[in-house]
């Protein structure tokens, strides 16, 4: 059943917007290995390292789904962390077309309604957009209230990797979503 973020000990983004703490919202755990072998780190290991670093916010953002929300919530409570929930979704132009090509996109809930929106579109992606992976398209993405989620371009598998239509896509996202970001990754050693 859909429960509220508050019930899960969740985090409203206003709780951290004025703090200067680094929050790793885009990380994966061993739960992402359902479809893509991406990470062997367990959430317990993240918690241990987060305590060493003095972090106070844990996220559950996995490939194609929100991850083990209940388990992460239990760990958050045990470690006195706040929790945020998101998904690294698979974005396609049309979820009804059977084509394995996709782009990654991160959706992070800013509030309880954002959490419900992510649950809703990912459920629909599994029902009507599943082709090897649950895929979302503009119809699902733009059905989300733009005030309820943070959207980022994810990683090297995101939409920015394809030059054709890149600028138009960025503007479309920026013009709809109130919090749309293009992350910067360090590639230096």
Q: Where does each model-flagged region fall?
A:
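Phosphodiester-processing cores and adjacent nucleic acid-binding clamps
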Residues: 1-189
């Amino acid at each position: 059943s859909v429960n509220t973020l508050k019930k899960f000990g969740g985090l409203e983004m206003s709780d951290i917007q004025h703090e200067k703490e680094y929050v790793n919202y885009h990380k994966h755990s061993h739960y992402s290995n359902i479809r893509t072998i991406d990470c062997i780190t367990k959430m317990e290991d993240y918690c241990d390292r987060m305590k060493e670093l003095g972090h106070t916010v844990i996220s559950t953002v996995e490939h194609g789904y929100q991850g083990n929300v209940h388990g992460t919530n239990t760990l958050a409570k045990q470690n006195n962390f706040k929790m945020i929930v998101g998904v690294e979704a698979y974005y396609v132009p049309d979820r009804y077309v059977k084509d394995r090509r996709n782009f990654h996109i991160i959706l992070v809930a800013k509030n309880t309604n954002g959490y419900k929106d992510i649950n809703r579109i990912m459920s629909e992606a599994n029902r009507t957009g599943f082709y090897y992976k649950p895929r979302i398209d503009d119809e699902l993405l733009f059905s989300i209230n733009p005030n309820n989620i943070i959207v980022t371009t994810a990683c090297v598998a995101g939409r920015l990797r394809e030059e054709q239509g890149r600028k138009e896509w960025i503007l479309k996202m920026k013009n709809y979503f109130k919090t749309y970001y293009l992350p910067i990754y360090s590639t230096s050693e």
